[in-house]
Amino acid sequence: MLKSFKNFTLEDMKAKRLELKKEYLDLRFKSIVGHVENPLKKREIRRDIARLNTIICEYELGIRKV
């Protein structure tokens, strides 16, 4: 998934992060109710959010070029 994030612009990454956060919240609610098809999806989404946060922070600090 990281390779696909490298081609995103900063605005695209922030939008994708917001989308993943909403999807993660949905999965959390579904897991409480007990209707989750793939319980490992929650972990994958959480890790993708962390990857995006890292890349966004690198752009803001100037470590990674736009």
Curated annotation (Swiss-Prot):
<comment type="similarity">
    <text>Belongs to the universal ribosomal protein uL29 family.</text>
</comment>
<protein>
    <recommendedName>
        <fullName>Large ribosomal subunit protein uL29</fullName>
    </recommendedName>
</protein>
<keyword id="KW-0687">Ribonucleoprotein</keyword>
<dbReference type="GO" id="GO:1990904">
    <property type="term" value="C:ribonucleoprotein complex"/>
</dbReference>
<dbReference type="GO" id="GO:0003735">
    <property type="term" value="F:structural constituent of ribosome"/>
</dbReference>
<dbReference type="GO" id="GO:0006412">
    <property type="term" value="P:translation"/>
</dbReference>
<dbReference type="GO" id="GO:0005840">
    <property type="term" value="C:ribosome"/>
</dbReference>
<dbReference type="InterPro" id="IPR036049">
    <property type="entry name" value="Ribosomal_uL29_sf"/>
</dbReference>
<dbReference type="Pfam" id="PF00831">
    <property type="entry name" value="Ribosomal_L29"/>
</dbReference>
<dbReference type="InterPro" id="IPR001854">
    <property type="entry name" value="Ribosomal_uL29"/>
</dbReference>
<keyword id="KW-0689">Ribosomal protein</keyword>
